[in-house]
Amino acid sequence: MEFIGRERELARIKKTLKAPEQRNVLIYGRRRVGKSELIKQALTDLSDVATVYYECRQTSEADNLESLSVLVAEALSFPPLAFAGIRELIEFLFVQAKDKNITLVLDEYPYLRDAVKGLDSILQTSIDAHREDSRLNIVLCGSYVEIMKSLIEHESPLYGRIDLALELKPMDYFDAAKFYPAFSPEDKVQLYSVFGGIPFYNRLIDQSQSVRDNIIELVTEPGARLESEVPSYLNAEISKMTNANEVFGALAQGYSRWGDVLAQSHVSSGPAMADVLDKLISLEIVQKRAPINDPTNKRKSGYFVVDPLSLFYYRYVFRNASARQLLDPEVFYDRHVSQDFEENYVPHMFEEICRQYLVRQNRTGKIEPAFDAIGKYWYDDPANKTSGEFDVVTQDPEGYAFYEAKFRKSPITQKMVDEEIAQVEATGLKCHRYGFFSRSGFEAGESDRTVFIDLPQMFG
């Protein structure tokens, strides 16, 4: 299976593990984001290293110890080994690594941490004792982000002992598209709008089928491969799913302000909704976003679902659960998904893709001057008694740059460009650059203050 993307993360892990001294690595991120495959890929390039890769279980210490002992014996070419406990096994590996390179990977570390009392302290004691005389590298990996983050906090026994802490995020649109290169740029936008940047989801996409057929077979038809992916993930993380479903339902329909979400979701109280939103934010499924020109104004802040599959699921599958069970899968898609997906959902997601494009260009030094902030811009227009927000605006040392994203079947014309700029300037926002993203190209000419970006550029 070809390994795709993650070049920067892979390079950082390899550099750390190839160091001559004892090293400890922490890798964490949401489920399905590709942590295990990333670690395995990094290990393939390590020569003369004995590797013990153990996927921890939600069982007892004794059960984990027995399984891990077998792997240790195999990796070191020893006869069957027996240890009194995990502490003794860890100490054994540190001693063995005094004259050889050994890497121990504990995948889903929180499971073993639950089973072994004081495991963080056990590791701390052995690391401190052998930091200078052992070449045992330890990689701790886990999907429970809050637990994994706590390992590098000041109160943790492992504080100051982790040489590389890497939070693995979903891929952006550009890297995600490498999983389905045969599709057109338009199709790639639609696929990312559903499957996002999770490698596990993207590997399931069949390039011999249409976007529509992939969505039906993987998400919307009863029994689809990813039918229960969103609810099962949330059920494992959230205790009160009724409230979560209500909040998701409101967010998926486009409500983002606190008061609007509370009213539309029918959650019993503000504190109850705050608990749900805080949890969803910690899971990085929802983000709280404030205007870049008024970042402390709570009234102008909004909540947005940033995980595409969760957004798609709650907008179409969860909302239409009864009809989905009654209709043929293709009829269901055509009746309850197709039109809104093309006219509203994908154009909305295209704005996020455009933001990702700008961030990618900015990080690689292709935007001058580089911007320090990107987000929505809130405006008040007293003359016309209106207020609102522009969706994609960046801020740099020279001021603001405005970007408009159009995912439509006709080109952006010069008239549209002029009208958009006039509308922006009428609000009092002065920009040194106006950028336009277009699905279907342009029938307009660039000037010294405009920049045009089409899909081939974005995926090139």
Residue ranges and their predicted role:
Residues 1-335:
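Phosphate-binding site recognition
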Residues 301-460:
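A cross-kingdom feature that marks ATP-driven nucleic-acid transaction machinery
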